[in-house]
Regions:
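Glycine-rich, flexible N-terminal cofactor/catalytic loop recognition
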Residues: 1-59
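A contiguous loop/helix-start segment that scaffolds small-molecule binding in enzyme catalytic cores
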Residues: 2, 156, 163-278
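Loop/turn-to-beta-strand initiation segments
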Residues: 3-5, 75-79, 155-156
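Short glycine-rich anion-binding loops that position phosphate/pyrophosphate groups of nucleotides
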Residues: 12-13, 83-87, 163-165, 223-225
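Short active-site oxyanion
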Residues: 26-32, 104-108, 156-157
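Conserved helicase motor
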Residues: 56-62, 136-139
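Glycine-centered tight-turn and secondary-structure capping sites
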Residues: 92-94, 255
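Class I SAM-dependent methyltransferase SAM-binding "motif I" and its flanking Rossmann-like core
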Residues: 95-153
Length: 278
């Protein structure tokens, strides 16, 4: 019989946030695959868990995944944990899950802590729709592309950042997105947990006197939909009317329908467009 891969969420700071189900599973499985065994041994020792461990991290995630899947196919049950939070959420996990599905190995996820959701729910920002970006790319070109995409993102944006990169990241976001409001969460669930509601400029001013410390989650307001619509309308209004018509007619849209679309874009009636085209 094939074993099961258990994705086990671990605390992001406060050890009391671990679930009874995760503790039971970590004790019952045959092997625990940990992102960093040196960190995870502290968690296991605290809860007196003696299950053997092996490393599974960013730099061995493919080769090691196949080794672990082979053990699963032999009938072994394996738990996957990361240093903090839920496997696969800005941490190793997605690759071994994909390989398990390809090999017909069962996977189940044991819910628990995730810094992005913890920060979002207490941010005071809209929670119904959000875009999780984790850490922005370090590659300069890719980073610029992602930040450019965020300019017109209307959903709440969640970004992770380390203290030594915080000022650089906030400065880049400020320059690209404007002075947005955000909630800054630091050291979540830990003794020195801190939440600050500010704008990018206020956060940069604050950083002049307070050196960034700890891990950060930035929960940023999305762009206002009405603002985007207004900007788009102004863009259409600046375009010559015939060029605006040609924009739609070049797509195979007949002139009558194109007039309707142009009128909508410009916030005027179809009759107004007709008169201007005479």
């Amino acid at each position: 019989m094939t074993g099961t891969l258990y994705l086990c969420a671990t605390p992001i700071g406060n050890l009391e946030d671990i679930t009874f189900r995760v503790l039971r599973t970590l004790k019952e499985v045959d092997l625990i695959a940990a992102e960093d065994t040196r960190n995870s041994i502290k968690l296991l020792n605290h809860f007196e868990i003696k299950t053997p461990m092996t490393s599974y991290h960013e730099f061995n995630k493919i080769d090691k995944a196949y080794q672990l899947v082979a053990k699963l196919k032999e009938g072994k049950n394996i738990a996957l944990i990361t240093d903090a939070g839920t496997p696969g959420i800005s941490d190793p996990g997605e690759d071994i899950v994909r390989i398990c599905y390809e090999e017909g190995v069962p996977v189940t996820s044991l819910p628990g802590a995730a810094a992005c959701i913890t920060a979002l729910t207490m941010s005071g920002r809209p929670t119904r729709r959000f875009a999780f970006e984790a850490f922005l790319p370090r590659d300069k070109k890719e980073r610029a592309r992602v930040i450019e995409e965020l300019k017109n993102e209307t959903r709440t944006i969640i970004i992770y950042e380390a203290p030594h990169h915080l000022i650089k990241t906030v400065t880049e976001l400020y320059n690209a997105l404007g002075d947005r409001e955000l909630t800054v969460c630091r050291e979540l669930t830990k003794k020195h947990e801190e939440k600050v509601q500010a704008t990018f400029s206020e956060l940069l001013e604050r950083s002049r006197t307070q050196e960034p410390r700890g891990e950060y989650v930035l929960v940023i307001c999305g762009r206002n939909v009405a603002e985007i619509a207004k900007e788009q309308q102004e863009s259409w209004e600046a375009m010559p009317l015939e060029a605006h018509m040609a924009h739609y007619e070049s797509q195979g849209i007949d002139r009558k329908e194109a007039m309707k679309l142009v009128a909508k874009d410009r916030g005027v009636s179809k009759r107004d467009i007709y008169k201007q085209l005479l």
